[in-house]
Amino acid sequence: MTMTDATTTDLPRWSVADVHASLDARSFTDALEQARADADRLVALFDELDIRATDTRPVTADDGAAADRALRELNRVTDAVNLLRVYVYATVATDSRHQRAQAVFSETRQLDATLRPLSSRLADWVAALGVDDLADVSGEVHDHCGPLRRLAARAGHQMTEAEEHLAAELSLTGSSAWGRLHADVTSQLSTEVELPDGARVLPMPAVRGLATDPDPAVRRAAYDAELRAWPTVEVPVAATMNAIKGEAIALNRRRGWTSPVDASLFANSVSRPTFEAMQSAVTSSLPDLRRWMRTKASLHGHPGERGLRWWDLVAPLPATATSVSWDEGVDVVRQAFGGYGPTLGGLVDRALDEAWIDAEPRLGKTGGAFCARFVDDRSLVLLNWSGSADSTQTTAHELGHAYHNTTLAGRT
């Protein structure tokens, strides 16, 4: 019996019906229409207040009032658009074949493209006037000094206002569209796996999950199935990856970044010395990792120069190779979180009771795992449960993000 047989029964699926009953519900269509109108009004407000690149000059009380209005509205509209996007993505991420959801998701991306140039304009404006000086005359700036300083620093790596607006608009048919194509193609890919108890057609997330199956024959069968499956979509997948990275390289160059790495480090608030220290630690640890891999190969019956087989790369050790049921995995996470504190421990049951989690691998569902902020202090957690210790760790990891989101609830 494989983990796919033993553990997919009654795995949880998330529900967002308490926010809107469906994509066709009047409440949702009204909210989407309101968001469109609010986004257009926000652009008009930024034009009215002249929130854009300007010459350095002394800050006035009028600037403080402008900052208060702009930031309040930007936060309000952004929160509303984010809620709509995540609501729709809850369907797209679990069923990429849902045509209505795909169409509406494209509309939410259009809203993102409308709002994105406004953050660039705000960055130029606060960089010119100075965050600290604006904070003296604006309560909103005072309350958001940290993110606004980051935004002001970003102004040194922006194109002109017109170019940033064009980049946002073109992304809809560029990197954003290519990214959706990649997700659609890979989520809808399935393949036949020659399992010990007979051939089965499985979606790719489920096939990937078999890489941690206790049975080496299952792991090898899954590996062989992957090698047969991926070449069938290699042309569109390669095209999407090249297009997305090509756009990023071009934009980073036009924005004055010396390398794509520097742009990524800034976006993730990681300094170059910190990055280099981490890289140095990884490099110095590689001999230990190689020794461990050779030891693991021997434990799996593959001693000698050929070393660890690909299908055993993430396999459990033979002595610990057991399947983990969903309930067992949840218990492990609950106990570990409870050891930290009752609030974190209680989050596990709350996430289950309130249907935050979608755990079942299935055709049309995005691979991997993620946690997305949703509404109030609530998150959505996507998993592709495979019944392994790795799946248990992934569940803990994503619920850890959910806990982080609860602590950030209400912040802008």
Which ranges hold each PLM region?
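Long, K/E/R/D-enriched contiguous segments that form extended
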Residues: T295, L299-G345, H404
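Catalytic zinc-binding patch centered on the HExxH motif and its immediate surroundings
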Residues: T322-V324, I357-D377
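A sensor for short, sequence-defined functional sites
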Residues: S119-L122, V126, Y340-L344, G410
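Active-site recognition of the HExxH zinc-binding catalytic motif
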Residues: S22, G256, S386-L408
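Long, positively charged low-complexity segments
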Residues: V348-D349, L382
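Short pre-active-site segment immediately N-terminal to the catalytic Zn-binding motif
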Residues: A321-W326, V332, F374-A396, G410
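Inter-helical turn/loop segments and adjacent helix faces that build the functional surface
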Residues: R272, L299, T406-T412
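A well-structured
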Residues: M1-P318
